[in-house]
A protein has these predicted regions:
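Hydrophobic transmembrane alpha-helices and their immediate junctions
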Residues: 67, 319-360, 380-386
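Alpha-helical transmembrane segments of multi-pass inner-membrane proteins
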Residues: 107-150, 160-219
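N-terminal signal-anchor transmembrane segment
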Residues: 1-55, 72-87, 140-148
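Long extracytoplasmic/lumenal interhelical loops at the membrane interface
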Residues: 266-320
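Aromatic-anchored transmembrane helix interface
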Residues: 36-47, 62-117, 137
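Hydrophobic alpha-helical segments of polytopic membrane proteins
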Residues: 3, 15, 172-249, 326, ...
Length: 402
């Protein structure tokens, strides 16, 4: 890899700034001038890439659907800021900033434009993604242990906690399948990631990891020679066995993990069902025609319930109404089509399907569309850029990644 060409490229600087921004509280104070400057840089690059993609490239349907999402959340986000209404998460008595809606959606969606454009212009390649896989894992570990330390410091009674970073680890899977062609490396890294997913004790992340493992096994048995099929099957069996053994270890040695398993078997969803019931009751019995069509505004679920819906479909329906649901359904229609369409590059198809599994499953039991980690969107933009025909627009030519 040519260091002068790749390490100091704008795409890599963007990632480094993103890492620095998400280390606020460790490297510098929360919401400091420096952190705001970092976020401003991210927004500047992201919106420039949004503009550049729309002006210079013939966009695939997936990117057009992302355009619709960005327009929708921008309108509702601006209205949220303009309204300046103070909303509280009653479950922990914390106020939600009026800018949080836009910040979360922008941090989640806009990096797709960055990776799409820089892939088209040759800055992001398969080798570059391979270079970043290990920093992604290291940074996820920093997030994991940082979260654990914070939870221990703020709670003197409990010694074990659920850790949302399990979702972050799981989002690195598509990058592994793009960056590494050797099967044994893929499976070792996948195993390492899944150990952290299980340790996080997030039931949704564990469920997604099981579905992902099933897909990885099926994919390894397709379109390969007999010898490769046996190797893939053997690696999959070892991977499942390793996950099972670690699951057993956690079950026997972690009281919290034991409780989480029992709650799952009993159908206890950590009050999520109660929130869903309250929001569904509102939509059926109390919502006006206007609110059914256009919603009650960004963060609207906090006006009805004591916390966010933790379900994209309910959250969007309450906040943005049927117009939001229609846009979101269209987004998923083209996402599925993008992931399932024939591709000459199997690793891109595998990465897209793993990304699709991760994001779609998460819509039902966690916030998904406004919480996609950059490890996922970085690869998602790359895959979409390389999963389209090589077209030019307004004399701008782009090149296929290595």
């Amino acid at each position: 890899m040519n260091l002068s060409k790749h390490v100091f490229s704008i795409s890599n600087v963007y990632l480094l700034v993103w890492f620095a921004y998400h280390l606020q509280g460790c490297l510098f104070s929360l919401n400091s001038t420096l952190s705001q400057a970092f976020w401003g840089f991210q927004l500047l690059v992201s919106f420039y890439c949004l503009y550049y993609a729309n002006k210079h490239f013939v966009l695939p349907k997936y990117m057009k659907a992302v355009n619709l999402l960005v327009c929708l959340v921008t309108i509702y986000g601006i209205l949220r800021v303009a309204g300046a209404e103070i909303l509280i998460i009653k479950e922990n008595d914390s106020a939600v900033a009026t800018t949080d809606f836009l910040r979360h959606y922008y941090n989640s969606i806009l990096p797709i434009y960055v990776s799409f454009v820089f892939t088209k212009t040759g800055q992001i390649t398969e080798r570059v993604i391979k270079f970043w896989v290990f920093p992604f894992i290291v940074f996820a570990m920093i997030e994991y242990y940082g979260t654990q330390s914070y939870l221990l410091a703020t709670n003197t009674i409990q010694q074990e906690f659920t850790n949302n970073t399990g979702y972050v680890f799981l989002s690195i899977l598509p990058a592994i399948f793009i960056g590494f062609r050797k099967l044994w490396i893929r499976y070792i890294l996948t195993m390492f990631i899944l150990l952290y997913v299980i340790s996080s004790m997030k039931r949704g992340a564990i469920l997604i990891s099981i579905i992902s493992l099933i897909y990885i096994t099926i994919s390894g048995l397709k379109n390969r020679g007999i010898l490769f099929k046996f190797i893939a099957l053997g690696c999959s069996i070892l991977l499942f066995y390793g996950v099972y053994e670690y699951f057993q270890y956690m079950f026997e040695n972690s009281e919290m993990f034991n409780i989480r398993v029992q709650e799952t078997l009993e159908g206890n969803s950590s009050s999520r069902d109660k929130i869903a019931g309250v929001l569904s009751d509102y939509l059926i019995n109390d919502a006006t025609i206007w609110s059914l069509l256009f919603g009650i505004g960004a963060d609207g679920t906090l006006k009805i319930s004591w916390n966010f819906a933790h379900n994209d479909w309910l959250e969007i329906m309450v906040d943005m109404g049927l117009i939001g649901i229609i846009v979101y359904m269209y987004y998923w229609k083209v996402f599925f089509a993008e992931a399932l369409k024939p591709s000459n590059d199997k690793k891109i198809k595998d990465a897209l399907i793993l990304a699709c599994i991760y994001c779609f499953c998460r819509t039902f039991f966690s916030q998904s569309i406004d919480a996609m980690p950059i490890y996922l969107t970085y690869v998602l933009g790359y895959c979409v850029a390389n999963n389209t025909k090589h077209e030019t627009n307004k004399n701008i030519t782009y090149h296929k990644s290595n």
